[in-house]
Amino acid sequence: MRNKVFFIAALMAGVAAQPLSAKEGMFTPDQLPEIAADLKATGLEINPETLADLTGFPMGAVVSLGGCSASFVSPQGLVVTNHHCARGSVQYNSTAENNYLENGFLAKAKSEELPAAPGSRVYVTTEISDVTARVREGIDALSPNERYDTVDQRVKDITAECEQDAGYRCLVASFYGGEEYTLIKRLEVKDVRLVYAPADSIGKYGGDIDNWMWPRHTGDFSFYRAYVAPDGTSAEYSEDNVPYRPKHHLKVSAAGLDDGDFVMAAGYPGSTNRYTRLGEVKNTFEWTYPTFVTLLNNWIDTIEEAAPEGSDARVKYESRLAGLNNYEKNLRGQIDGARRVNLVGLRAEREAELDAWIAADPSRSGYGEAIAALDELSEESATAARTNFWYGNVTNPQLLGTAQRLYRLAKEKEKPDAQRESGYQERDMAFFRQGLQALDRRYDASVDKAEWLLFLNGYLAQPAAERVAVFDQ
């Protein structure tokens, strides 16, 4: 599952007190009715069927920020999210003299709320539809390149049709490697304002040592407010805008939790790879994640050295540092967790059972052939990914990356809009401009140069087979 779509993670509170549910894990909402009996037995008190409706209560109160999950918690458009999800907006409004990162921020009235960082959005899901048949029609007979181009164009066409309704941002999400496609229509709230963010001493209490750990005693929350035009339509920032009135909002219970209480987290964490093959799992945990962890630690050290504490440059790069530390801790935890549960060994056992099942009946031989072809493609993909990893990093610094994107934009604009690559269509231009605007407050030449030298040296240290010949010239 590749695109950012709605997932639910179900688990039991009081982990030490009793075993986890057999259905622990990440599920799409439409899968929940299938495990309704287990959910009820585990402690869910509402009808599991209601959790499959993303436009009804309670799921309609859960929204996406385009990279984070959030929820409406008032009829006046108040949105609660994680502190780190709003930290970029806190950083954007901070200076060395007026540092909201250190001091926190509170708007005591709506008139005191601050504009969120450029490009900030609240996406409210309004409609879900299955478009699998339309996307996949006739593609099985096509060559791989034709198949890719056909699917890509159909997805763009479906998205464009959906976005003919002004103020909406649409997404075609792919599931199971292109087996299923779902169209998600979302109201795009463009006027987002910062209401409250705790000081880092609260919002980042415990720092990266406590991050991703349990129990955790961090005030990891912040508040935004969503605004729309007086007629309720999506609009850019304006003093005339009014708070968005959501159809549904959540009420926060003051009762707290007891050991064994049922807990379900609903949101947009991105993707899950439950059916990844053994070779892909091994490549992920033996090369990709360890290599990335090493790079992230060097990257963090480079920024901290080039942007000392208390400098204006450190304020500009605080949000990036927080993101890098967050990601490094996450990857390191995944590596440790995979080793602890013997993930590679368990996956090998599962695949051995599958191989035995296929071998037991000659009529199943087609499955074996398909799996062998898939594994071969996975090996090719892993090799290409290593080259892309180092090349992507060496072109990652902000100034060089911005220059590349501007050049690419100029080339893409030579094409009809419908044929441009995603990210360079007219629907993407607002984000493009806002990204350039945000760069102004998140760029320091000396830090950017230090980052680039780190990436360049890492790239040059790789064998020629893992570098890009054209770039080397």
What are these model-derived regions, one by one?
Residues 8-16:
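Bacterial N-terminal signal peptides
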